[in-house]
From Swiss-Prot:
Active site per database record: H64
One record GO biological process: phosphoenolpyruvate-dependent sugar phosphotransferase system
SUPFAM superfamilies for this protein: Phoshotransferase/anion transport protein (SSF55804)
Subcellular location: Cytoplasm
Protein name (record): PTS system fructose-like EIIA component
Organism of origin: Escherichia coli (strain K12)
Amino acid sequence: MAALTASCIDLNIQGNGAYSVLKQLATIALQNGFITDSHQFLQTLLLREKMHSTGFGSGVAVPHGKSACVKQPFVLFARKAQAIDWKASDGEDVNCWICLGVPQSGEEDQVKIIGTLCRKIIHKEFIHQLQQGDTDQVLALLNQTLSS
């Protein structure tokens, strides 16, 4: 997986619901050249949310999906000041999203990346850094996490 760059991070994502946030994440993935079709990837993310919320807890969601439109594994990060209902496991609204996309054949990559993120998301300091950090801080935090 390629390292995240500043163009993979949106600290002021717009939208008041799952559809609008996921649509913007799919657009960011397309703009970064990670996918070939933003609509197809959006449908993948929406289907995953319909099966079970990706709201991990503590204000963080990890929307993810495998799709033929994904060219290489990638991670994006988005945040907004106002949290929105994401039907998270702890009932808290979400204001941070770590979005993961992998090619259709990327089951192993997906499991590895989600496992790495989940081991970090349980720590309050990690969440605090995601919620408060500037672009450079979030970039360094996620790149360090994903390379370990």
